[in-house]
Amino acid sequence: MNTTAASVCLLAAIAAGAAPIASAAPEVEVLHFWTSGGEARSVAELKKALNAKGVAWKDFAVAGGSGENASTALKARVISGSPPAAAQVKGPAIQEWGKEGVLANIDAVAVAEKWDTLLPPAVAGIMKYKGSYVAAPVNVHRVNWLWVNPAVLKKAGAKAPTTMDEFFVAADKIKAAGMIAVAHGGMPWQDTTVFESVALGVGGADFYKKALVQLDQAALTGPLMLKTFDTLGRIKTYIDRDSAGRDWNLATAMVINGKAGMQFMGDWAKGEFNAAGKNPGTDYLCLPAPGTAKAYTFNIDSMLMFKKPKAEDQKSQLLLASAIMSPQFQEVFNLNKGSIPVRAGVSKAKFDSCALQSMDDLDSTSKAGTLVPSLSANMAVGTAAQGAIMDVIARFMNSKMSSQDAVTALAKAAKTK
């Protein structure tokens, strides 16, 4: 969208706080997959922020933690010529949609509010297509977390693990005490969440980048990838037989209620602990996945804006983008979601120890070059290759496929275009 006189007037309203409109409020339809308890609380805050700017929220929620169902729904709407105003889309998929010529330019608000100075350069780059902003970033999630119930550890006589060897010692003790060692949901994206943390722990950030971002064939077929699958194969023996099709938040609930000891999951899991009234350090532990303390797999949620013919809809999109980037919204949304603010200038006072650790580690890994995009969270590679890779990992998790066969299949899947 070009910066017109109407846009200038709109930005003046944004700068002034955009008081609620007395007449029938304009509406913005938002497609998203934030449907769990903690996520729903976060969405409610975005609705409030948007309503405060005089825009009504039209909810288009599609359940499914990986976003696959939402992606299918979005494609159908775009093909029909009636896309939503905004959709929860992230990573390389933003560029893929840009190539289709269906995205709205939101530079009018991004330039006025100086997003380039508020966002880390790596994040700003992801939000742009051909140099212009087309998406508003909501948060930063760390994916390589291990969530632990300390009461389960105590009952089993186990210690919180920091290495993979320590993890297996703890898992054995939890299993011997009659509890489930690893809470997990048997879905491809959850399988891949475990896989990528194992790969990062086994090979480090350089190996991770070569294998799972650059899709380098030597890295994909080498000994570190074989060790990754060997380790993953051992982990799956600690998962209960009823895991198939289990939603991630139900697996988190198993850790919350003491049915299971540990879960590999991004820090959106913390939103579930918070919703259950649990406190970090006492009721649960947030630990970097074994062997990954000096690395950080990131997942950035973002709202991608689609071209709308009506000027009113275009104005509503800019107001939505402005609301998302406001420090007030960034604070309250991320407190509910379990993530951390993506922009500078947000108070840290209300964030807990897990979030503060995530903030510190984001900064240190960014400086050290060990900050890497999450494969499972759609941040690392294009959708075609990602889907093929995740299928291989899921087959390995749900069959007697050997590690070597998995390595061979993974290398082939990585060539998918």
Residue spans of the language-model regions?
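Conserved N-terminal structural module of periplasmic/extracytoplasmic solute-binding proteins
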Residues: 21-100, 112-115, 160, 244, ...
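Extracytoplasmic/periplasmic substrate-recognition and gating elements
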Residues: 26, 48, 52-53, 156, ...
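A structural signal for short loop-to-beta-strand junctions that line the ligand-binding cleft
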Residues: 76-77, 83-85, 115-151, 180-181, ...
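Hinge/lid segment of periplasmic solute-binding proteins
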Residues: 92-143, 168, 194-196
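Short, solvent-exposed loop/beta-turn-alpha elements that line the ligand-binding surface or hinge
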Residues: 107-121, 125, 186, 202-227, ...
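Extracytoplasmic/periplasmic solute-binding protein
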Residues: 130-138, 168-217, 260
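Glycine-centered hinge/linker elements that transmit conformational signals in sensory
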Residues: 171-173, 214-244
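C-terminal capping/gating helix-and-loop segments adjacent to ligand/active sites or protein-protein/ligand interfaces
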Residues: 214, 303, 345-346, 359-414
